[in-house]
Every structure is written in structure tokens, then in C-alpha cells.
Amino acid sequence: MKNKEYIKTDVVIVGSGVAGLFAALCLPKDKDVLIITKENTNECDSMLAQGGVCVLKDLNDFKCYFEDTMKAGHWENDPDSVKVMIESSQEVICTLIDLGVKFDTDKNGEYDYTREGAHRRNRILHHKDETGKEITATLLDIAKQKENITIVPRTTMIDFIEKDNVCQGIVCEDEYGEMGSIIARDIILATGGIGGLFLNSTNYPHITGDSFALAIKHGVELKDINYIQIHPTTLYSKKKGRRFLISESVRGEGAILLNEDGERFTDELQPRDVVTNAIVKEMRKYGTDHVYITLPTMNTEEAAKRFPNIFDACMEEGYDITKDRVPVTPAQHYMMGGVKTDLYGRTSMAHLYAAGETACNGVHGKNRLASNSLLESLVFAKRAADVIANDNSEKKEDYNEVDLSSYPAKEERQKEFKKLIMDEIKEKDKDFYDKWCNIQG
């Protein structure tokens, strides 16, 4: 059948993570906002973010924070993007606090800033070891109460509706296989990364880069699509499924990495790609598929309080991280590249925006600095929302009628999308592809 019935709204946001939710909440109340999300609203990678969220504590830290971000990114970052993110950090963190987000405090009631790999100073706010969950759940609860925001779970974007490089909406499919169209003045892509395409990833398996595949199909510009972060420390397990992250904040609190002989072999607080390479070198040296992590600076009670989820996950596998050597191994974690945007989330297609891990404005360069992901999502989602809110230009609805019967079945579509993305990565960086992408999900 052809698309004669459709939903019409002001803004459609694809994704219910931090970027999508914060963008929705930053839009004015007179904008009707429709959020669709691929699975249940709580099944997004933002919920999994453990370590924390960076903030510029004071102006004296600006130069150091800027340099730490640039150095971690191998100086391939866009400096303007980095400046905007850092300069906007205090504002968005204050907004989160006003919305009810709780960050941990020390015994004096002051915010407890921690430090992670490649940070020279403590500048990371956290909520135990579930900072992403605290932020995302708070934003989600507020969004559900807003009359102008509607959230539709278990609905997948399968195409853009566009003509002459102007986006008019999206085609989507619900959990029952029913297809439909959403026509909107503005569209924000916030679908996360591509972890679901890998055999070993910290991401949810349904995070499969749909926005990237559709961008390729429709000629929307991508940037640094081969810049994919492998996190050095995920809990080693023979079980299939998503890999459990052992947050970098554990190493920030004194955890050390050991090889098969029980020897330290690297500076644990180097950038993620450096630590990952050091681990891979040790695994090859000993012919193993893991190394070990242990946290000698805390006792059991302290670790259980500071890192409750990590502590429990290790205990379920039979390890007390404060006493035992816990096996860890690298796994795909984050996408630095993505749909190319400017500093306001605008893509190369009119009225199509991208935010969060889906977007790439160059802020992370070749390797993301720990705990910059939540901050980046918040800062640039707000900037995209601000542009949409202040855009009073006329937009003509002009698009070809959508033939819903022309779309392939779900399994065939997923294979097509995966091939589009992997071929693009292979073309950009065959060495990375051969090393990591040949081991796919």
C-alpha cells in the first residue's frame, strides 16, 4: 500500500537517549515533539554510561581540559567544537541539577570530582557508577510529563522522506511489522552508534547505526566513520551478548592492570586507545584473550559503595575486584565519527539534524576522552534545539508519495544496512576493519 495515512508533527526525534531527550526538553512548549525509539525507552546506551560527565570546574582549568581532550583525540579534533563543549559545560550541568539530577558529594557536602584516563585533573561528576542512568532516567521522567512530547517505543526508522536534499520526515516500522510515515518540519537523529554490528561490544545489540546507513543511501555527508573506539576493559566472559564495561573511573580510583605473570605492563591512565593497544600486545605475547584488573586501593565495602554495579557484576562471575584478579578484554565501545554536523547539529541535508554519538562535529578527534560523551550529547543537542526553536523560515512540504510496499523485509534490510556501513569503514581504514570489524555480530 502507499502512504496515504501518516502522522504529522513539528519535530520528530529518533532515539531516547540523553541527546534525544535533552533536545526534546530544550524545545519550546509550543512545538509538538514525537520521539521514537527502537526498543523500550530504558534500553539505550546512555543508560549504560558509568564513569561520569565532565565539567569545566573553573576558568583556570580551561587550557588543561582543552589540551587533554585534544591530546586524547590525537590533535585531530575540531578545536572550535572542543571550545564550545567546554565553555557550555557549566550551563548544561547546572540545568541537569535544576532538573533533579543527583551527583555524588564528599563528606563535606561538596561535589566529588573524580579523574579518569588522560585527564590531568579531577573534573568528572558522577553518580556512583551509573551516571548515565541517573541523567537519562531523570530526563525521561520529565519528558513523559510534558504535554507536547510523545514517546513511542519499539519503533524503528527505516528511511528518510526527502526531496531535493530537504528532509520532510521518516518512514518507520513498529514491533508488529506495520509501516508508516511521520512528516515533520525538523528531524533529529539521535540513534547512537554501531555496537550492535560487532560480536563484542558494550552497546545494546539493537544499536546498529541505522542513521549512518540511511545517510549513505541518501548522500548525507559522513565524517570520520572509521574512528571507532575500542574500550580497553570489559569484563571477560564466555557468555554471549553485550559486554559489561569496567569503567575507566575504576582505574582513576587506583585499579591496576596485570598480565598473565601478575606484572603491571602499562600506565592505566593513558588514553583508551593506548591502553587497548598495550592490552592487545600482552594478549598476543601470552597467547590469551584477556588480561587482569584489580583494585588494591579500596576495601570491599568501599568498592561496593563507590562502584555498586561493577562490584556486583564481578561478584556474579566469582571475583572480588579488591582482592582478586578480574579478567578483562577490549571490546567495541563508541563511535567518534558519524553523520557530519556543524556546531548546531545541522547535517548536509536541510531540516535534518544529528546529535549525540550519531553526530560528528569533530569534537572527539580520533579517540574520545573519557566522560566527554554525555557532555557532548547534552551541549550539542541543546544547540540543535535552539536553532530549531528560532527558525521562523517557511518550509514547503514537497515530497514524493512513499510506497510502503517497496521496502524489504526486516532481516534483508538489516543485512543491507550493515554492509553499507562496514563497506564504508573498510574503504576508509582497511587496517582497522581487518583488526576489529571482521569479528562482527
Language model features: what each stretch is:
Residues 1-2, 7-9, 18, 26, ...:
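Glycine- and aromatic-enriched mobile tails/lids
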Residues 41, 214, 220-320, 387:
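An anion/pyrophosphate-binding glycine-rich loop and adjacent beta-alpha core
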Residues 79-90, 123-141, 152, 202-209, ...:
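Short beta-strand to alpha-helix junction loop
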Residues 32-37, 224:
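Short beta-strand "acidic-cap" motif of Rossmann-like dinucleotide-binding folds
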Residues 54-85:
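Glycine-rich active-site loop/strand segments that organize a redox cofactor
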Residues 186-240, 244, 374, 378:
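Glycine-rich loop(s) and the adjacent beta-strand/alpha-helix scaffold that form part
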Residues 152-153, 158-167, 172-173, 306-360, ...:
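A glycine-rich dinucleotide-binding beta-alpha-beta segment and adjacent secondary-structure elements
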Residues 98-178, 190, 234-237, 257:
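Conserved redox-cofactor binding core of oxidoreductases
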